[in-house]
């Protein structure tokens, strides 16, 4: 899977960082040391790390991913990364 989306809440710049959904590459999620969780009331799971986005972005860069775009949506920051 060449694309990855990660996000965090602006008020939570120091983490946690959401790094994937229930359909994400499990090998990549293991490399990021992400835990799969389901928040009460949601009918989907997501992978999360207890690190700031900067640390996660650095890990993904070492794995060959590059930031394609970044945006703020309300109180959420989102990065899109791609691996050639």
Curated annotation (Swiss-Prot):
Per the UniProt entry, what are the Gene Ontology biological process annotations, in alphabetical order? negative regulation of biosynthetic process
Q: Which residues form a coiled coil?
A: none
One Pfam family cited in the UniProt record for this chain = GFRP
What protein is this chain from?
GTP cyclohydrolase 1 feedback regulatory protein
The record ties this protein, via InterPro entries, to: GFRP_sf, GTP_CycHdrlase_I_reg
Please, which domain of life does this record's source organism belong to? Answer: Eukaryota
The record's GO CC annotations read:
cytosol; nuclear membrane
Q: Where does this protein chiefly localize? A: nucleus
Key word Cytoplasm present: yes
Q: What does this protein do?
A: Mediates tetrahydrobiopterin inhibition of GTP cyclohydrolase 1.
Q: Does the keyword Cytoplasm apply?
A: yes
Sorted keywords for this record are:
Cytoplasm, Membrane, Nucleus
Organism field: Xenopus tropicalis
Q: How does it assemble?
A: Homopentamer. Forms a complex with GCH1 where a GCH1 homodecamer is sandwiched by two GFRP homopentamers.
Q: Where in the cell is it found?
A: Nucleus; Nucleus membrane; Cytoplasm, Cytosol
Family of the protein in this entry? Belongs to the GFRP family.
